[in-house]
């Protein structure tokens, strides 16, 4: 395992359609666009785009995923990491200010609070996508689709191990409570298998 690193990502492009979808708006959301724009304008300057991450060895055997520092038990994750000898483990957050805005408008403007929820969800997903793309480009590798605790049969308790090895509170101010909820709430932890060079060459030939 190499050392744990912290990276601040340049603000990803904002996808209005995705934010509206996360906010629960249907296809006919024309009347919500103005509220979305105003909400994003207020939230935008308060957001951060921080990631802490490390590369770990991975050995899979049935539902056991052995990362050296800890083990996770999931057939779905094991299948996802099949063919990889190393894995990128990361935690990402857009910061606590979006939570504060949501709480404030939850009291005075519920519709704006819902829109801010959608913006926060879009922003953290965009951050994860941007980070993974940047990692691939900087390291000349390909990553498998990211896989997070709580998805499929991967226990949410796996969060504890990720937080321990990445030192999330120290590095990016991300904490985990006894109910396994993250704070700030617009945060993600995930595994992304690093495709071995031989497999990458095969994929490139297929393309």
What are these regions (language model features)?
Residues 104-117, 145-152:
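Surface-exposed loop-to-helix/strand elements on domain peripheries
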Residues 1-113, 191:
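Active-site helix-to-loop segments that bind/position phosphate- or nucleotide-bearing substrates
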Residues 49-56, 133-148:
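Flexible, glycine/charged-enriched surface loops at secondary-structure junctions
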Residues 94, 141-207:
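Short terminal or interdomain "cap/linker" segment that borders an active site or interface and mediates
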Residues 111, 118-133, 137:
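Compact, glycine/acidic-enriched structural inserts
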């Amino acid at each position: 395992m190499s050392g744990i690193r912290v990276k601040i990502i340049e603000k990803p492009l904002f996808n209005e359609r995705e934010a509206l979808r996360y906010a629960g708006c249907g296809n006919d959301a024309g009347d919500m666009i103005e509220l979305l724009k105003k909400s994003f304008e207020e939230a935008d300057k308060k957001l951060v785009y921080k990631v802490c991450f490390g590369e770990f060895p991975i050995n899979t055997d049935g539902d056991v995923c052995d990362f050296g520092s800890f083990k996770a038990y999931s057939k779905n994750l094991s299948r996802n990491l099949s063919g990889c000898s190393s894995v990128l483990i990361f935690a990402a957050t857009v910061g606590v200010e979006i939570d504060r805005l949501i709480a404030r408008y939850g009291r005075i403007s519920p519709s704006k609070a819902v829109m801010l929820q959608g913006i926060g969800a879009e922003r953290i997903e965009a951050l994860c996508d941007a980070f993974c793309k940047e990692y691939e480009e900087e390291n000349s590798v390909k990553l498998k689709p990211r896989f997070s605790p709580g998805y499929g049969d991967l226990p949410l308790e796996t969060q504890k191990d990720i937080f321990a090895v990445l030192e999330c509170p120290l590095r990016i101010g991300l904490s985990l409570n006894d109910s396994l909820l993250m704070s700030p709430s617009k945060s993600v932890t995930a595994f992304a298998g690093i495709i071995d060079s031989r497999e990458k060459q095969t994929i490139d030939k297929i393309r």
